[in-house]
Amino acid sequence: MHPTVTELVEHVRDLPMSMSETLPAVIVACDDADTSVNALTSLISSDQSLVAMLLKLANSAYYGYARRIETLPEAIVLLGFSTIKSLAITATTMNLLFQSQDELSEVRHEIWSHSLGVGVAARALARKRGNIHPEKAFVAGLLHDLGMIILSVYRKEDFVRVLAHAQDTHVTYEQAELELLGFSHADLGAEVAEAWSLPATHCEAIRTHHHPADATLQRGLAQVAHLADWMVVDLGIGLLVDAEQPEPDEQALAEFRIPRSELPRVVESLRRLFADSEGFDVDATADAVREAI
């Protein structure tokens, strides 16, 4: 019998990683213009494992600052609330993904590589477009495959079976999920994000990142996650580079002013961004969290 979305959400609702309480509160505080540095410091300090992960990531190659950051208040002042929010979400997502070592550890590393790449690409696209906050775009990109992460950790056999079906039959991973499980990782990820009280716009972006035209709250956020996902797959980063890849959404391309004929150029510019950026270091960010958890 296959698990339902509701059963999986209930299974992970109270994960022993402080995500159910601390992370949503941090997100709300970072988005509140009235939150002070002292208040945010006090909130995050209630979870010392999160403090450790934040400082590890802040000093890693990926989120590195010009000088070493020694304390949480210093990190908040130097990096800003938006980046702190992204760091908190990055840390807790990695904690979930790398909390155990097993036969799927390398596979999860590929999932993380893809997720991080989509986050970076979404941030770059948002900066170029100018009407979406870059850090919100990063979070939407980073979490777009949250449902896949949940499956790989808590339903390993189903995850492996779906992955093999997608590769063997040359259908999309989403189609393989629907055929074998009756739900998609996008649906599961959105439900888990809602259970963790993440913002509704991010939940919607997760749910609709394969079909951004279905988004109604903030379509641009779903579109940027969709385009970034497509481009990172096109670059060959992640698990599903050999699976069927549908064409990018035309409305999303138009919204981001990317003519279809220009897609190869945009993807190549993204390749250069990754190649030139010391920050795109999956191993460094993974090691930072492994040392802290």
Predicted regions and their residues:
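Terminal helices and disordered tails flanking the catalytic cores of nucleotide-processing hydrolases
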Residues: 1-8, 250-293
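Conserved alpha-helical "signature site"
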Residues: 1-250, 287-288
